[in-house]
Amino acid sequence: MPRSLKKGPFVDQHLFVKVDRENEKGTKNVIKTWSRRSMIIPDMLGHTIAVHDGRKHIPVFVTESMVGHKLGEFAPTRTFRGHVKDDRKGKRR
C-alpha cells in the first residue's frame, strides 16, 4: 500500500539539508548517505548520491524518471553469482 498523498514524500532531514546546501552553492558534489528509505524529490535532480548497500556506497545519478522512487531501489544489496552448473561428466556408473 503506497504512502498517503496528504503526508507527502519522506526524506531524512540530514539528507535534505545536504541537498539544499548543494543547491544553494550551485555545486554538484557527491552526497554520501545511508538513508535508503528516503524518496527522491525534484530538488535532487542532477545530483549524484552515493547510497550505502551494506558494504560500500553506490553512486546514483538522479534523473527525472527516478522522482518518486526510493534511493534504495537503485543500490542492490545482494550480488547474484549465478547457479552452479551440473557436473554430469564427473559422475560415472
Swiss-Prot record:
The UniProt record lists the keyword Protein biosynthesis: no
Pfam families, per database record: Ribosomal_S19
Instruction: Please give the InterPro entries that the UniProt record associates with this protein.
Output: Ribosomal_uS19, Ribosomal_uS19_bac-type, Ribosomal_uS19_CS, Ribosomal_uS19_SF
Q: Name one GO cellular component term.
A: small ribosomal subunit
User: What are the protein's GO molecular function terms?
Assistant: rRNA binding; structural constituent of ribosome
- UniProt-listed SUPFAM superfamilies: Ribosomal protein S19 (SSF54570)
Task: Say if the entry is tagged with keyword Signal.
Answer: no
Gene3D superfamilies hit by this protein: 30s Ribosomal Protein S19, Chain A
The GO biological-process annotations, alphabetized, read as:
ribosomal small subunit assembly; translation
Which PROSITE patterns has this protein been placed in? RIBOSOMAL_S19 (PS00323)
Q: Any idea which UniProt keywords this protein has?
A: Ribonucleoprotein, Ribosomal protein, RNA-binding, rRNA-binding
The protein's matches in PANTHER family, at most eight in alphabetical order, are given as: RIBOSOMAL PROTEIN S19P FAMILY MEMBER (PTHR11880), SMALL RIBOSOMAL SUBUNIT PROTEIN US19M (PTHR11880:SF8)
Instruction: State the protein's purpose.
Output: Protein S19 forms a complex with S13 that binds strongly to the 16S ribosomal RNA.
What HAMAP family does the annotation carry?
Answer: Ribosomal_uS19
Q: Which family does it belong to?
A: Belongs to the universal ribosomal protein uS19 family.
Protein name listed in UniProt: Small ribosomal subunit protein uS19
